[in-house]
């Protein structure tokens, strides 16, 4: 079988073998419903508690009860935005939300929905580096602002937003602060207390855990109307039978993610830089966004004169997986929203290719990718009508 190279780790990651190993007994032997009073149910409780302990410590929350299990970050994001709508907009008359133009569709689409209900949403523009400033947030906040929602790291460029500065402003103004940390956890340190975060969303499958499980950090003392109603699971905050094997897997994945942070910075970051520097030697290739303030695994490359989709499928034929942007929107074949937001032409914005590494990538894989990418760029430009 030909070697396959996976460089789409911002879309999803492979499960770490250690995560699979710790999940297996709960898929096979310890399958009881945790809410049941018999031993099949109660024997799962220690493992759930241990997993929650790993999760809250992984983001430096104060208490184990500050982390609520969800199905994914999309659910977590929806819960925060819609919960704030009920708690702040309807009950207190605060009908304003501040976010950015480059948020994940799970946030943007939910904000669009809330706008249809009469909520005013300010979408902060990004600068030429792909970022915003804390001052922009400060200027956007009004007496009617209920929530500020800004992602910790961008899913396409990897750029890190000034979360600590924004958190300090929100705390000073008495405004709730939410961050989608899906692309930050496992790549850089995430500290909810230091950042003054009220809500933080994450998904296990982005840091080598299973798909279909995620979480929401809710700062102690902050209320949030439940998105789901039913049983009294998670202290009545999120109904639904607890998915024990996936919770156990997510806890272990978080623990391993924190343990590998130095490796991400020193090894994965150097592999990304090697890949990037080699691709920049190809004529008319550029890196999109700030190359300094970003997570260590991600690069967004623009290859002038070549449609991103054409490059994507050429790489795919050589068994290399990459992306043109968010996996939740990439099938639409739209211009890259980050490139559009920084002012690139739609023609140029269609040339984006995202390459995102993980701790399981090797230097040999990067060398092979450089070779294949360079050959593909030459071949595709030879048949391009726009280069």
UniProtKB/Swiss-Prot annotation:
Identify this protein by name. Answer: Cysteine desulfurase IscS
Could you tell me the keywords of this UniProt record?
Answer: 2Fe-2S, Cytoplasm, Iron, Iron-sulfur, Metal-binding, Pyridoxal phosphate, Transferase
Outline what the protein does. Answer: Master enzyme that delivers sulfur to a number of partners involved in Fe-S cluster assembly, tRNA modification or cofactor biosynthesis. Catalyzes the removal of elemental sulfur atoms from cysteine to produce alanine. Functions as a sulfur delivery protein for Fe-S cluster synthesis onto IscU, an Fe-S scaffold assembly protein, as well as other S acceptor proteins.
- Binding sites annotated in the UniProt record for pyridoxal 5'-phosphate: 73-74, 155, 183, 203-205, 241
Which EC number(s) does UniProt give? Answer: 2.8.1.7
A single GO BP term for this record reads: [2Fe-2S] cluster assembly
Cite a single Pfam family from the UniProt record: Aminotran_5
This protein's gene is called: iscS
Which cofactors are required for activity? pyridoxal 5'-phosphate
Reactions catalysed = (sulfur carrier)-H + L-cysteine = (sulfur carrier)-SH + L-alanine
Q: Which HAMAP family match?
A: Cys_desulf_IscS (MF_00331)
Q: At what positions is N6-(pyridoxal phosphate)lysine found?
A: 206
């Amino acid at each position: 079988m030909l070697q396959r190279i996976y460089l789409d780790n911002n879309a999803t990651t492979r499960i770490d073998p250690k995560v699979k190993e710790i999940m297996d007994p709960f898929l096979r032997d310890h399958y009881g419903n945790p809410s049941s009073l018999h031993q099949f149910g109660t024997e799962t409780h220690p493992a759930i508690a241990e997993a929650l302990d790993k999760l809250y410590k992984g983001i430096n929350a104060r208490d184990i009860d500050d982390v609520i299990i969800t199905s994914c970050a999309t659910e977590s994001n929806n819960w925060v935005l819609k919960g704030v709508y009920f708690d702040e907009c309807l009950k207190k008359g605060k009908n304003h939300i501040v976010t950015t133009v480059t948020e994940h569709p799970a946030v943007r689409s939910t904000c669009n929905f809330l706008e249809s209900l009469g909520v005013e949403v300010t979408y902060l523009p990004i600068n030429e580096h792909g970022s915003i400033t804390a001052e922009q947030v400060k200027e956007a906040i009004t007496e009617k602002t209920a929530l500020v929602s800004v992602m910790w790291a961008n899913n396409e460029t990897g750029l890190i937003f000034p979360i600590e500065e924004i958190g300090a402003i929100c705390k000073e103004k008495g405004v709730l602060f939410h961050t989608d940390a899906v692309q930050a956890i496992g790549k850089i340190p995430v500290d909810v207390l230091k950042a003054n975060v009220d809500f933080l969303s994450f998904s296990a499958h982005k840091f080598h855990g299973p798909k279909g499980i995620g979480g929401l950090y809710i700062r102690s003392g902050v209320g949030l109307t439940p998105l789901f109603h039913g049983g009294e699971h998670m202290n009545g905050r999120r109904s639904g039978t607890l998915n024990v094997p996936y919770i156990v897997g997510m806890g272990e994945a978080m623990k391993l993610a924190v343990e590998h942070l130095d490796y991400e910075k020193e090894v994965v970051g150097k592999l990304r830089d090697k890949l990037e520097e080699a691709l920049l030697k190809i004529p008319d290739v550029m890196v999109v966004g700030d190359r300094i303030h970003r997570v260590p695994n991600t690069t967004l490359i623009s290859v002038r004169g070549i449609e991103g989709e054409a490059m994507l499928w050429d790489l795919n034929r050589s068994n290399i997986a990459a992306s043109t942007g968010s996996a939740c929107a990439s099938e639409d074949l739209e211009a890259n929203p980050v490139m559009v937001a920084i002012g690139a032409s739609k023609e140029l914005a269609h040339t984006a290719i995202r390459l995102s590494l993980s701790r399981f990538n090797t230097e040999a894989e990067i060398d092979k990718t450089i070779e294949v990418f360079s050959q593909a760029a030459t071949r595709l430009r030879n048949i391009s009508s726009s280069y």
